[in-house]
């Protein structure tokens, strides 16, 4: 690791502001390993330890941190949520995306904040598959209720937006979000039965008129067992392999098909954000059987990710000539066409100039609707 410098002090201030309740040695360990994750881009404990002078001592220190029972995973998740609330902008929509990520028998439920075409995990829970058996929807609703309620209390219901995939299409979630007054667009399964104009029909039996790609179905009653009045649309979309598929989207607002697709199309940023955590920050390389230790390591990765996005917000999204010049320095080192995300660009830049961490501050307001400028 690099010696103590102003960049370390900035990160230390950020961790202190985020975890004021943690002991000093806990905050120092979190700071050191968050910085190691950013430097080494790995979640492998051995590789992280190699970045320190004494590898054996660093390995033991990381193990103590990840197995420290006083650092409860739920407290770390709460700290991540509170830090995100501090960094939310004062204006504009605040979009939340829900997603599960699975590694063997370990399941991670993540509530992410959409930032441009990417997302930052702001709240999470990790579970063993055996614990989730028969309780998955109930546990998910409890986590979502806590995260979404706190965000809406901060920004107001009019600014909130929630998107989720088919696994979250549940009457209990629809009821909660509608009762909270927050707008949502959730993809539902094609086998779902919906009552339109008094006639119950399964969505996959409906057809598009002519060669159109959008069809608003209007307001219908979702789920015959516990009817929910929702606006439903269907749209043709290509998947990652270029094959045509159909999105059946349910919303509690009278969105047109185009509006519903545009809103839901931001949700893949959540998947992209998880890929950033897994590959750019190396969480995919983590190998831990104990679910609480795995959750604590994800907390370190989530902190590292929000640090990177905060720096990118201050340095790359400023919208001036200097920001474009700095971004061009990253692009100039790549061959041919390349698509840079906010995270990959900032990570590449930090590798070139580690002292950029001097610009970190715990109160940086995230620019949720901004994306990288196009440079050549």
Which residues make up each language-model segment?
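Alpha-helix boundary/capping residues
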Residues: 52, 69, 264-267
């Amino acid at each position: 690791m690099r010696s103590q410098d102003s960049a370390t002090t900035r990160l230390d201030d950020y961790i202190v502001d985020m975890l004021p309740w943690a002991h000093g040695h806990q905050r120092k360990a979190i700071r050191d390993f968050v910085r190691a994750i950013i430097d080494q881009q790995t979640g492998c404990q051995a590789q992280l330890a190699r970045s320190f002078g004494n590898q054996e001592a660093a390995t033991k220190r990381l193990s103590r941190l990840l197995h420290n029972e006083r650092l409860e995973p739920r407290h770390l998740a709460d700290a991540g949520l509170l830090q995100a609330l501090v960094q939310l902008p004062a204006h504009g929509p605040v979009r939340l995306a829900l997603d599960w990520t699975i590694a063997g028998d370990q399941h991670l439920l993540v509530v992410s904040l959409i930032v441009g075409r990417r997302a930052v995990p702001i709240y999470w829970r990790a579970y063993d598959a055996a614990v989730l058996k028969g309780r998955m929807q109930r546990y998910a609703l409890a986590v979502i209720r806590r995260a979404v309620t706190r965000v809406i209390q901060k920004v107001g219901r009019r600014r909130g937006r929630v998107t989720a995939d088919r696994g979250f299409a549940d009457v209990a979630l629809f009821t909660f979000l509608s009762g909270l007054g927050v707008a949502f667009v959730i993809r539902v399964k094609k086998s779902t039965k919906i009552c339109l104009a008094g006639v119950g029909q399964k969505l996959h039996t409906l057809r598009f008129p002519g060669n159109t790609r959008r069809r608003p179905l209007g307001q219908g009653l979702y789920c015959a067992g516990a009817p929910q009045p929702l606006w439903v649309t269907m749209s043709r979309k290509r998947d990652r392999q270029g094959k045509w598929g159909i999105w059946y989207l349910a919303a509690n607002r009278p969105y047109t098909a185009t509006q519903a697709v545009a809103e839901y199309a931001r949700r893949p940023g959540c998947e992209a954000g998880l890929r950033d955590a897994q590959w750019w920050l190396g969480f995919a390389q983590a190998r831990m059987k104990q679910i609480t230790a795995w959750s604590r390591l994800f907390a370190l990765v989530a902190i590292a990710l929000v640090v990177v996005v905060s720096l990118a917000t201050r340095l790359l999204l400023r919208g001036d000539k200097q920001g474009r010049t700095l971004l061009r320095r990253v692009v100039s080192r790549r061959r041919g066409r390349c698509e840079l995300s906010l995270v990959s660009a900032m990570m590449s830049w930090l590798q070139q100039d580690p002292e950029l961490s001097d610009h970190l501050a715990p109160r940086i307001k995230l620019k949720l609707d901004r994306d990288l400028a196009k440079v050549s």
